[in-house]
Amino acid sequence: MSVPRLGVGLQYNPELIGWFPFLDQPLDALEVLFDSVMGPLDGPGLISPRSADIVRDAVGSFPLLGHSNYGGDFGFDDLLSTAAALRHVPLAKQFGVSWVADHCFYSDGSWSDVWSSPLQFSRAEAARVAARARALQDLYGVPLAHENAAYYRTCPGSDLSEEEFLALTLELSGTYLHLDLHNLYANAQNHGASGYSIERFLDTIPLERIISIHMAGGRWIDGQYHDLHDTQVPEAVWDLLDEVLSRAQPGAVILEYETQALHADGATLDTERTTDLILADLERARQAWDRAYGPGSRRTTRDKVGSWTPS
């Protein structure tokens, strides 16, 4: 499957809509959270009525990428009964997305804490997940990329490392990797003492299967580091971006901001300051991309700085 080389973009998060000027930015791509815009499974509409205007504006402005958190992609319900098949697949086709990324957790009630509940890193689960991933990619008709998750503990029964599990799943499924660099950083903070290694992770995964990258920030709370997307990107994650861009050729780097402001606890929302911080991160990501691939390599700069042919 072909993957377009786009550049640097943002995730179109509902918590920012209304005060962050998405449509005024020279974005190379916009990532849409399918879970946030889809209509309920027990209703008649594909798109939630409250999201219709938002989606219409986005579709006409940028190349779109899809993202699934709660599609039940890797759970145990019949795949064709999941939100992924019933809502995310038709949304992907309607939006004309270049690819879809999904989170590597169960998201179907298998664990009580869905967000921080990783898949079981085992050979048996790699085979089961790969079969579902291959079938889901066929339904989408575009590349499906799996996002490495931030997690607080591994699933009981795991007999592989996270990176070994991902590499085996990709080998068996023929799907792709959506590399979240902040999730790598978060896991290293929380599990480094027990042997988690970013260097080993990057040396093990098939770098040629990376088609997109996530960048975000987070913070320490009560002795654990959390992937909250509520700060600017940490310096160590910028260093990881430079390293990965030197070793792989993704189609896009997407920045994520999930809370209403990048501010200290208890502070009042300052949209002007927060907008400036997000724009500063965007510009820094563009600079990293341009250092790696050249100033004419992004979608918004190719016509301005000549053509570019990926290797």
What are these model-predicted stretches?
Residues 264-298:
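C-terminal helical cap(s) of enzyme catalytic domains, especially alpha/beta-barrels
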